[in-house]
Structures are given as C-alpha cells and as structure tokens.
Amino acid sequence: MQPQLSRPQTASNQVRKAVSGPWSGNAVHKAEKYFITSAKRDRDGKLQIELVPASGRRKLSPTPEMIRRLIDGEIEIYILTTQPDIAIDMNKEIIDMENRYVIDFDKRGVKWTMREIPVFYHEGKGLCVELHNKIYTLDQFFK
C-alpha cells in the first residue's frame, strides 16, 4: 500500500515531508496539534498570530523552529472555522465543505463534518490554508 499525502491536492511546491496527516487515522497521536486562536494586525498592519497547543497550556508564536517542525510533520496547525478573525465568509465555505466532507462512518446517520482547517507551509508563500483548491496565505485569510 502506497502512503498518501494528508491533503489529496498537495502540489510538489507545497512542502511537507511526512505523509501522515489529519485524515489518516488518529492524527492526535501522530503529531503535536496546535490551533491558531488569535490573528490580529499590529499598528503597521503586520499579522500577529497566536498559537495554542491542543492541551491549551501556553500561548506561542509561529517561530522558524515551529515552521520547520510543521514541514517535518512533527506538529500540525489548524484554524477553527469559528475563528472570528477570518476575513473570508466562512458561512458559505462551511456549507460547501460540509456537503463535500460529510461521511457516514457507521451507516447510522452519525456524521462528521470538517470544522478544522489545516495550515501548511507553501514554498515562497509561507503558512497557508486551502479551501476548495484555492490557496490563501494566512495574511490573505485573516482580517
């Protein structure tokens, strides 16, 4: 069985060395999970991102070391779709994503819908997200 990338649309210029990811088994045990909890602009208009691990113990910033760990697959970073700092109209996007990703695992009507958006490193652009095969830098994605 061939290993598959965690995001099926991953292009060759999207850097990710590890092949396990959020849609392959229980990803919580494969990599440290972080969430972007705040994305505010400073006085100069530069985006200031705040990360919190899934354990919720401390607040961090995306350092070059964390980006290297993301590329190596040691950590995974997500944005919750309820994040108030998102600039894109997520109400429309989530409806489309729910229609696309709803899976009835046990055939009893119990369904899972995507509520976390994975963040990845795109060579030349930096940290990015992908919605409907369109790549947004975090600078474009947040207000």
UniProtKB/Swiss-Prot annotation:
Any Pfam family matching the protein: RC-P840_PscD
InterPro entries xrefs: PSI_P840_PscD
Alphabetical keyword list: Electron transport, Photosynthesis, Reaction center, Transport
Upper taxonomic lineage: Bacteria, Pseudomonadati, Chlorobiota, Chlorobiia, Chlorobiales
Annotated region (Disordered), positions in chain: 1-24
Biased segments, Polar residues type: 1-15
Subunit organization: Component of the P840 reaction center.
GO BP: photosynthesis
This protein's record includes keyword Transport: yes
Protein name: P840 reaction center 17 kDa protein
